[in-house]
Amino acid sequence: MAAKDVLFANDARQKMLKGVNLLADAVKVTLGPKGRNVVLDKSYGAPSITKDGVSVAKAIELKDKFENMGAQMVKQVASKANDEAGDGTTTATVLAQALINEGLKAVAAGMNPMDLKRGIDKAVDSAVEKLRAMAQPCSDKESITQVGSISANSDRAIGDIIAEAMEKVGRNGVITVEEGQGLSNELSVVEGMQFDRGYLSPYFITNQDSGAVELDNPYILLVDKKVSSIRELLPVLESVAKASRSLLIIAEDIDGEALATLVVNNLRGIVRAAAVKAPGFGDNRKAMLEDIAVLTAGTVISEEIGLELEKATIEQLGSAKKVTITKDTTTIVGGAAQESAIRDRVATIEKQIENTTSSYDKEKLQQRIAKLSGGVAVIKIGAATEVEMKEKKDRVDDALHATRAAVEEGIVAGGGVALTKIASELADLKGDNDDQNVGIRVALRAMEEPLRQIAINAGDEGSVVANAVKAGDAHYGYNAATGEYGNMIEMGILDPAKVTRSALQYAASVAGLMITTEAMITDHVADTSSEI
């Protein structure tokens, strides 16, 4: 077993604190509308320029292993806040730094670390309750625009395009961010259900100009297996031919004589048909087929439930107003489903989202809801250079997560004002003993730190701004972009309550662990400098 280095008590805490401050000092310069940029070196290609706190945090790895342990723990704060709310990473880091610095001073002065932690937790729990009570619903387009703009570092164009996307696809809709080709941002909305599977043969193409298959008012056959024999398909093909309508077949795969016969029928004009592979893999494929069945009022022909393809009837086929198939995608518009059937299916998937802990599964389930709800928006980012493109894409991603968080839990006054006001309201909060009271004071002082840092980054004196804001009414705050004071809600400076809440909770969690740390152990690094 490798030799270990061990540090105890104050020696351990000082090393850890040095790492915390190194990382936090690099991250906090990005906070607020006048936050500075950080340039990150890459092992290949051009360096990237960012104002995204979590990107800066992830880039930092320290040489000293004890210092690095402190830095990595604060990095965890930024990552956790980013995972839950998608934004607020810099705020979380600033809060954690303030809590750890003040907390360790109190420990050095002889306070009981466990009581300090209990005091911090008590203050944070009370602050979260007040934050939830303070939150206002965010549902109108202007509020969403303002939240998006603030999160994207006061870029109104980004706020506008996100609000427009949300208006078009709804709160359950999927909004994806891609790199565009031009200089300006573009928004495109895909109506209906789209999935990433194209036609199985170019002979199905009906529109030679666009190179797409376009089927009007088609029947849709859904099969949960591979189809190779034409014998299985004949009854359905004959029924569709009699009805003089086109047919889309979605199956695990179609090949051999089945595919060849469909192509021949197409070329001769007997039955206008097209075939695509079912989207997804494994259990996800079955779920997606069921979604398409609900959307088109059809039935999945599956031997698992005793349905055979040879005995399929025309009543088991789904239908839609239009289907467009390119070489890469299939889009179903105007499925024949009743609204109530889609609502029930969406409700079922929402329950699955509540019960799953995997962020990957949640994302996939959310995409299924969006496809059923008929909303997928794509924001294409325009920029002059690749470096600018990466920086802008990071900001749009942050803004998108912030607006989702705002719609979910509401909005509060931005610019660090909400936490500063809450700290003032909790000034009389008391713990069970004097050490807990110190912990409460540490937490309340730390809650002012984001506002102070925003003011410092804007070139103002943090303490002066904090005192002025505390003296004002509920929404009175400081607009760092203009240097003016006023009503933050009216000025459109808003923060999602979820972002502020998660930043505070994760910062307090890690700070509590660090304050109560008494020993640090790491692998011993042999000194090779004297070796020849």
From Swiss-Prot:
Q: Which residues form a coiled coil?
A: none
Where is it predominantly found? cytoplasm
- List the CDD domains: GroEL
Positions bound to ATP = 30-33, 51, 87-91, 415, 479-481, 495
Query: Which keywords does this chain's UniProt record carry?
Result: ATP-binding, Chaperone, Cytoplasm, Isomerase, Nucleotide-binding
* Enzyme class (EC, first level): isomerase
Family listed: Belongs to the chaperonin (HSP60) family.
Q: What is this protein called?
A: Chaperonin GroEL 2
Species assigned in the record: Vibrio vulnificus (strain YJ016)
